[in-house]
C-alpha cells in the first residue's frame, strides 16, 4: 500500500503467525453453545428407514431366490459401511470426544475393518480469564484492553501493534450490544448496579480480536509511525511471601492505546503493592489509566488528572468490595511522561526516584503513619497511630493512604499526592518500586548498583532490574519486590563517555592531602566508577565476576604526579656503556608537577652544589655516604648524599648481605641527608609523599624503583625482574628467592627483601 509504514511487513508477518496459534475465540477454552445442535438431526433422520428397507429386501430375496442370500448380506454390509463413517467425520469436526466414541462403538460390532479416526488438532493454549466474575459498564473498556494486551503480549507482539489492536478491539466491543451479557437482577426489591458477566464479555472480546487480526492481514490499515520508546527493565519476585500481590503496568505507547492524535508523546508506568489480597492491585492496574484519560483536565493538567483518577479508582473499588465482600487494598505510584514533563502521583509507600547526573533526586515522600502531617490527619478523624512492630493506623496497617481498605475508611484514604518536574536532558533514569525494595535499599545504594551493573556490562541495561531486586533480597527483604527502571537517555553512550573522562577528573588533581600514603594508586583504572562495586548473587549468573574491590583502583584520589617518559625505574640495559652499573649513579627518576610538595621545593632551594659522580664503586664498611641523583622539580639534576646509619652493604656486585636476618631492620634506617658546604649544616627532611606512584613495567631486564617514604616508615620498594643471562644463573636466583625471600640483582651490591 502506498505510504505504508516500514514496519508493516513485520506486523503482517506477526499477524499471520498469531492467527496460526490463535485459531478462534474458543480455542483451548469452552466451546460455543450455538454450533453444538447442528450435526445432531443428520444421523437421526437418515439411518432410521434403512433397516426396514434392508429387512424387506432380504425377505423377498429369501423367498424368491434362496441362493442369493449371501450376496444380499454382503450388499447390506457394504451399505452399512457407507453410511456409518458420516457421523464419525461430523463428530471429529465438532471435536467432541464423547460423540466420536459413541459413533465408533456403534459401528464396531460385527465389522472387522474400521477406518482410523482422523488425527486430533493439538490443544490450544488457554485464553486469559478475567479475575472477577462480574463488572459494571464503566469497567468494560479497561477489561477489554487488558484482555487483548494479555493475549498479544503472550506472543511477544510489538508494543505499537498491540496497542493498536487492543484499541480497535475495545472500540468494537463498546459499540456492540452488551445487553446479552447482563446478569439478571436479583428479585429482592433493591435496585442494584447493572453488571456484566465477564466470561461472556471475554468470549466477545476474543472473537472481535480474531476478526480484526484476519482483516488486518488482508488489508493493513494506514497507521502513523511508531514512536521511540523509553528503554525499560522490569523484574518482580514473590520472594518469601506466600502470594504475589504486586502488579505493575508499562504502557510505552499511551497515545496509540487511547487513540490520542493531538498530544505529545506520552508514556505511563505504575507499580501497585497489594495487601490483604491481590484484587485491589489488579483492579488499579487495569482501570487507573483508563480513568486518567476520562478526566476533563487531562489535556492541560495531567498531575491533577492523576489525583482524580486515583480518587475515582478508589471509590469504584470500594463499591466493588462491598458487592463482593472484598477486604483488601493497594498502594500505588504512577509516573506519566508527556513530552519533557514528568508527572508523579502516589498513595502509600510505593516510591519512585529520579537519577540525574548520577545523583539521586527525591520526587516524593511516601504516605506512612509516622509522618507528622499524616498522624495529625488520622488523629483529627478520630483514629490513632500506635507502634506494633511498626507505626500502624489503629494498630492495623502500616500505610496511611491506599486504594481500597473499605473497613479502614476514612483513616486510610485514597487521596493521592502529585509532583511535576521538567526533564532537561540530564536525567539518567527512573526507579519505580514497592516498599519491598525501598525498605532495604536506600536511593544512593540503588544508584551504585545500577552504575556498577552498567559499567560491568558495557551499558547493557536489560538485567538492571534483576540486579536491583537481588540487592534488596540480599539486604534482607522478605516482601514481594517489584522494580521498574525507565531509562531517559542512552546509558551506553554515558558509560563510554565516562570511561574516557572520569578517571582524568578523579585521579591526582590538586595537592596531596592524604599524607602521601596512597599505596592503592598503582594500577590502571579500567572502569569509570571503581569505588562502589556490588557483588551480584550467584543465581543471576555472575559466578565468574570479580568484585572491583579486588582490583587495584584508586579509592582516595591524590595529587597529580607527572612522570618522565621512562618513569621511576632504572633500566640498566638502556644506560650508556661509559656509565657504571651501580647504585652510586641513578638516573633522574621523578619530576613533580604543579602539585609538588612544598618540602621538595625547599630542597631545591637549599641545594646549590652538584657532586661529581665517581666511575667506580668503593667498598663500604659500617656507616657511610654515597651520592645519588634525583630531579626534584625543574631546577636541574641535583646530587644528594644518601647516608646509612648502619652497614647496608659489603663487597661488590653479586654479593649478598653478610647478615640476611637483619636486612629489614637495616633498610628501615635509610634516610636522606643533604649537604650545603657554605652553611655548614645538614638538613634532614621527612617526606610524607611517595616519590613513585607507578608499578614496575614487568619487562625483561633489571629495573629499580626509586626510594619511597611514608609518614610512618621509610623503606625501599623495588621490583627486579633480573636478566636471564643463563639457565644456571636463573636457577640460582630462583633457589635463593625460595630460600631467603630475597631478590638478587647482579648489577647492585645488595639484595632487596620482598615486602
From Swiss-Prot:
Biological role stated in the UniProt entry: Protein phosphatase that inactivates multifunctional CaM kinases such as CAMK4 and CAMK2. Dephosphorylates and inactivates PAK. May play a role in the inhibition of actin fiber stress breakdown and in morphological changes driven by TNK2/CDC42. Dephosphorylates PRKAA2.
Where does the record place Acidic residues bias?
31-68, 77-101
Answer yes or no on keyword Repeat.
yes
- Designated name of the protein: Protein phosphatase 1E
Q: How is the cofactor bound?
A: Binds 2 magnesium or manganese ions per subunit.
Q: Which cofactor does it need?
A: Mg(2+); Mn(2+)
Please name one Pfam family that this protein belongs to: PP2C
Q: List GO BP terms, alphabetically.
A: cellular response to lipopolysaccharide; cellular response to xenobiotic stimulus; negative regulation of protein kinase activity; peptidyl-threonine dephosphorylation; positive regulation of stress fiber assembly; signal transduction
Q: Which family does it belong to?
A: Belongs to the PP2C family.
Q: What is the effect of changing residue 311 to G?
A: In a breast cancer sample; somatic mutation
In which residue ranges is the amino acid composition biased (Low complexity)?
Answer: 102-113
Residues bearing Phosphoserine are 535, 548
Q: What subcellular compartments does it reside in?
A: Nucleus; Cytoplasm
Outline the segment boundaries, as ranges, of region: Disordered.
21-131, 498-537
- Which reactions is this enzyme annotated as catalysing? O-phospho-L-seryl-[protein] + H2O = L-seryl-[protein] + phosphate; O-phospho-L-threonyl-[protein] + H2O = L-threonyl-[protein] + phosphate
Q: Name one GO molecular function term.
A: protein serine/threonine phosphatase activity
Where the record annotates domain PPM-type phosphatase, the positions are 231-488
Region: 11 X 2 AA tandem repeats of P-E; residue ranges are 31-52
Residues that bind Mn(2+) 1, according to the entry?
273-274
- Record the organism: Homo sapiens (Human)
Amino acid at each position: 500500500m502506498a505510504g505504508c509504514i516500514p514496519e508493516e511487513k513485520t506486523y503482517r508477518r506477526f499477524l499471520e503467525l498469531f492467527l496460526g496459534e490463535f485459531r478462534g475465540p474458543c480455542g483451548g477454552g469452552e466451546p460455543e453453545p450455538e454450533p453444538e445442535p447442528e450435526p445432531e438431526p443428520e444421523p437421526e433422520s437418515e439411518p432410521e428407514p434403512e433397516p426396514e428397507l434392508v429387512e424387506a429386501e432380504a425377505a423377498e430375496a429369501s423367498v424368491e431366490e434362496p441362493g442369493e442370500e449371501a450376496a444380499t448380506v454382503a450388499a447390506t454390509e457394504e451399505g452399512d459401511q457407507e453410511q456409518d463413517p458420516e457421523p464419525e467425520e461430523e463428530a471429529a469436526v465438532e471435536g467432541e470426544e464423547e460423540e466420536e466414541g459413541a459413533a465408533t462403538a456403534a459401528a464396531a460390532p460385527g465389522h472387522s475393518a474400521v477406518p482410523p479416526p482422523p488425527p486430533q488438532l493439538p490443544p490450544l493454549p488457554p485464553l486469559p480469564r478475567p479475575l472477577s466474575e462480574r463488572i459494571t459498564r464503566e469497567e468494560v473498556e479497561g477489561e477489554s484492553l487488558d484482555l487483548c494486551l494479555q493475549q498479544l503480549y503472550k506472543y511477544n507482539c510489538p508494543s505499537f501493534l498491540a496497542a493498536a489492536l487492543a484499541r480497535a478491539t475495545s472500540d468494537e466491543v463498546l459499540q456492540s450490544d452488551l445487553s446479552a451479557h447482563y446478569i439478571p437482577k436479583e428479585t429482592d426489591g433493591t435496585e442494584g448496579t447493572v453488571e456484566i458477566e465477564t466470561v461472556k464479555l471475554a468470549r466477545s472480546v476474543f472473537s472481535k480480536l480474531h476478526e480484526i487480526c484476519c482483516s488486518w492481514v488482508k488489508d493493513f490499515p494506514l497507521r502513523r509511525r511508531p514512536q521511540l520508546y523509553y528503554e525499560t527493565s522490569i523484574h518482580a519476585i514473590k520472594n518469601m511471601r506466600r502470594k504475589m500481590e504486586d502488579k505493575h503496568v508499562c504502557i510505552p505507547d499511551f497515545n496509540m492505546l487511547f487513540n490520542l492524535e493531538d498530544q505529545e508523546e506520552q508514556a505511563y508506568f505504575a507499580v501497585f503493592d497489594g495487601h490483604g489480597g491481590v484484587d485491589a492491585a489488579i483492579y488499579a492496574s487495569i482501570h487507573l489509566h483508563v480513568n486518567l484519560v476520562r478526566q476533563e483536565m487531562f489535556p492541560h493538567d495531567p498531575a491533577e488528572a492523576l489525583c482524580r483518577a486515583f480518587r475515582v479508582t478508589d471509590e469504584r473499588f470500594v463499591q466493588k468490595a462491598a458487592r463482593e465482600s472484598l477486604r483488601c487494598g493497594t498502594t500505588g505510584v504512577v509516573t506519566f511522561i508527556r513530552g519533557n514533563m514528568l508527572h508523579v502521583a502516589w498513595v502509600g509507600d510505593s516510591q519512585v526516584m529520579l537519577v540525574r547526573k548520577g545523583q539521586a533526586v527525591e520526587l516524593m515522600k511516601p504516605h506512612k503513619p509516622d509522618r507528622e502531617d499524616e498522624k495529625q490527619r488520622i488523629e483529627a478523624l478520630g483514629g490513632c497511630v500506635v507502634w506494633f512492630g511498626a507505626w500502624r493506623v489503629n494498630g492495623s496497617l502500616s500505610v496511611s493512604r491506599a486504594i481500597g481498605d473499605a473497613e479502614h475508611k476514612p483513616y486510610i484514604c485514597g487521596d493521592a499526592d502529585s509532583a511535576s518536574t521538567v526533564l532537561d536532558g540530564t536525567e539518567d533514569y527512573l526507579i519505580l518500586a514497592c516498599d519491598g525494595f525501598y525498605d532495604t535499599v536506600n536511593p544512593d545504594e540503588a544508584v551504585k548498583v545500577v552504575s556498577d551493573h552498567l559499567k560491568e556490562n558495557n551499558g547493557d541495561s536489560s538485567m538492571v532490574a534483576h540486579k536491583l531486586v537481588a540487592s534488596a533480597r540480599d539486604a534482607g527483604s522478605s516482601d514481594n519486590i517489584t522494580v521498574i527502571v525507565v531509562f531517559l537517555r542512552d546509558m551506553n553512550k554515558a558509560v563510554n563517555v565516562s570511561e574516557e573522562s572520569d578517571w582524568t577528573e578523579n585521579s591526582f588533581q590538586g595537592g596531596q592531602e592524604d599524607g602521601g600514603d596512597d599505596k592503592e594508586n598503582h594500577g590502571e583504572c579500567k572502569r569509570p566508577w571503581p569505588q562502589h562495586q556490588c557483588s551480584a548473587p550467584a543465581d543471576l549468573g555472575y559466578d565468574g565476576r570479580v568484585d572491583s574491590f579486588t582490583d587495584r583502583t584508586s579509592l582516595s584520589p591524590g595529587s597529580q604526579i607527572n612522570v618522565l617518559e621512562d618513569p621511576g625505574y632504572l633500566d640498566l640495559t638502556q644506560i650508556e656503556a661509559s656509565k657504571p652499573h651501580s647504585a652510586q649513579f641513578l638516573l633522574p627518576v621523578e619530576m613533580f608537577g604543579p602539585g609538588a610538595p612544598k618540602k621538595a621545593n625547599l630542597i631545591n632551594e637549599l641545594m646549590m652544589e652538584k657532586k661529581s659522580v665517581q666511575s667506580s664503586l668503593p667498598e663500604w664498611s659500617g656507616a657511610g655516604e654515597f651520592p645519588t641523583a634525583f630531579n626534584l622539580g625543574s631546577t636541574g639534576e641535583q646530587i644528594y648524599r644518601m647516608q646509612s646509619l648502619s652497614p647496608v652493604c659489603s663487597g661488590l656486585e653479586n654479593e649478598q648481605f653478610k647478615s640476611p636476618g637483619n636486612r629489614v631492620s637495616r633498610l628501615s634506617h635509610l634516610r636522606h641527608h643533604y649537604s650545603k658546604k657554605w652553611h655548614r649544616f645538614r638538613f634532614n627532611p621527612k617526606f610524607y609523599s611517595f616519590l613513585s606512584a607507578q608499578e614496575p613495567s614487568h619487562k625483561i631486564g633489571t629495573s629499580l624503583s626509586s626510594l619511597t617514604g611514608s609518614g610512618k616508615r621509610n623503606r625501599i620498594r623495588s621490583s627486579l625482574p633480573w636478566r636471564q643471562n643463563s639457565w644456571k644463573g636463573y636457577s640460582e636466583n630462583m633457589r635463593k628467592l625460595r630460600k631467603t625471600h630475597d631478590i638478587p640483582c647482579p648489577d647492585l651490591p645488595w639484595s632487596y627483601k620482598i615486602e
